[in-house]
Amino acid sequence: MGNQQQHPIGIFDSGLGGITVLRALYRQLPQESIIYFADTARLPYGDRSPEELIQYVREILTWMEAQGVKMVVMACNTSSAIALDVIRSEFKTPVLGLILPGARGAVSQGKRIGVIATQATVNSGAYENAILEANPEAAVWQMPCPEFVPLIEANRINDPHTKRIVQKRLQPLLEQGIDTLVYGCTHYRHLSGVIQSILPSHVICVDPAEYVVSATEQELELMGWKNPQSPLPTRFAVSGCPDQFAQSAKGWLGHQPLVEQVDLKNLIMNASPLSITNG
């Protein structure tokens, strides 16, 4: 692969959620080149079986490696919870997930911890296990929020119906007296305004995106892979409709990106490097 320092970091999610990780990377590692992939054709991930998720991530990692990435960040809690260990055993490229950094961030803030996440992430028990491993004295309550991702992807963040759904999902956690709330899905940061309007002021929100980017920086330093030069423009690719993703991403990026469509089913035959797009 040549000089690893100048190779891009790969980020992937099922959709818009990973943009929260992308923006954290822009802030903390502005010199790094990035490839962002959204598996929008198979969104949402939260109701997929473990077998399906592992296969999806295999396909994405195969494509990412063909693009020459030096590292991959799973900007998706569901795939981090279900597929991370399997994928790490199958691919040479270093892969970072959200669960462990997010759990460590949570226990640094409080002891009565609520986790909002997809059904698959909740079912996996990954956050609860990681939080209790980091602090056995912590108390953890999890709440699946299956409605959140479709509402965010449909750009219904400011819809009164959305606030009612968020209130319904948060209420059981508030009744437990949580002092910390973990965004256990990268999409949920997009609802932070709604969520924080409902939470008492003393409840601290933890965004694992910030912590996984810090872990990414530490890994790059350890490997000697930090990019000493200016970054290339961010490259965006999706498995679904490029125009739809570009329009939806515009509000979060501040500009409308150029987006390439990738057919993951044919990726082994056609995994040629992406042309650089504006970002």
Curated annotation (Swiss-Prot):
Active site: C76, C185
Binding site for substrate: D13, S14, Y45, G46, N77, T78, T186, H187
Assigned EC number: 5.1.1.3
GO molecular function, one term: glutamate racemase activity
Keywords: Cell shape, Cell wall biogenesis/degradation, Isomerase, Peptidoglycan synthesis
Catalytic reaction annotation: L-glutamate = D-glutamate
Pathway, per record: Cell wall biogenesis; peptidoglycan biosynthesis
Transmembrane portions of the chain: none
First-level EC class: isomerase
Pfam families documented for this protein: Asp_Glu_race (PF01177)
Gene3D superfamilies: 3.40.50.1860
GO BP term (any one): peptidoglycan biosynthetic process
Highest taxon listed in the record's lineage: Bacteria
NCBIfam families: glut_race (TIGR00067)
Function as written in the Swiss-Prot or TrEMBL entry: Provides the (R)-glutamate required for cell wall biosynthesis.
Family as reported in the entry's similarity comment: Belongs to the aspartate/glutamate racemases family.
Full protein name: Glutamate racemase
